[in-house]
């Protein structure tokens, strides 16, 4: 179910991000975890970045070829033995386990030169830590790539999916349950090496 979620700010000072379904489309997606929480078991959610290639040609992110019409997702994870940067894990969770229903995404077009900004960020920040979790990692990468007009701002020191969802309210519409089915196979980067 594809839809748009309109924030309380719509019609006031909400901003619209330019996003055509062509070129490179960068997205930040967040899921607050509430629908997956159970009594005595809290799900804190997850946040990740997506890159959708609609350029008409193959682009490269690190050593990953992304052919036209395909996409890649990535974020840091606290997976046992793999506290690094994982690629295309989220689409697997969505397709095989029905996870992240109700996820919210904000998207904008970027230039191919911004791929270098993403790669540099990945080189410097390829690990999950308690204070630099998936939400912290994703929002800082997003802000480094998109610039001030599309930057997301949160309050407080701890970055969570719920705070990113609140930051989305600065924009007039956000996509609900974005489709990530065109992503590839799962792999990991840790200490600059692909595994």
Question: At which residue positions do the language-model features occur?
Answer:
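Classical Sec-dependent N-terminal signal peptides that target proteins to the secretory pathway
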Residues: 1-9
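Non-catalytic ligand/cofactor/substrate-binding and regulatory segments of enzyme domains
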Residues: 11-132, 164-195
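Active-site nucleophilic cysteine motif
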Residues: 43-46, 127-162
């Amino acid at each position: 179910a594809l839809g748009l979620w309109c924030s309380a700010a719509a019609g006031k000072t909400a901003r619209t991000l330019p996003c055509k379904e062509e070129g490179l489309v960068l997205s930040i997606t967040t899921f607050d975890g509430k629908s997956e929480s159970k009594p005595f078991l809290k799900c804190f959610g997850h946040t990740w970045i997506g890159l959708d290639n609609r350029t008409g040609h193959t682009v490269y992110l690190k050593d990953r070829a992304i052919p036209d019409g395909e996409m890649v997702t990535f974020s840091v994870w606290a997976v046992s033995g793999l506290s690094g940067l994982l690629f295309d894990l989220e689409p697997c969770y969505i397709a095989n386990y029905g996870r992240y229903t109700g996820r919210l995404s904000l998207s904008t077009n970027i230039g191919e030169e911004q791929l270098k900004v993403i790669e540099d960020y990945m080189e410097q920040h390829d690990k999950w830590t308690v204070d630099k979790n998936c939400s912290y990692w994703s929002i800082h990468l997003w802000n480094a790539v998109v610039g001030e007009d599309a930057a997301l701002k949160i309050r407080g020191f701890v970055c969570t999916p719920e705070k990113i969802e609140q930051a989305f309210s600065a924009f007039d519409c956000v996509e609900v349950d974005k489709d990530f089915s065109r992503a590839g196979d799962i792999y990991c980067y840790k200490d600059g090496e692909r595994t």
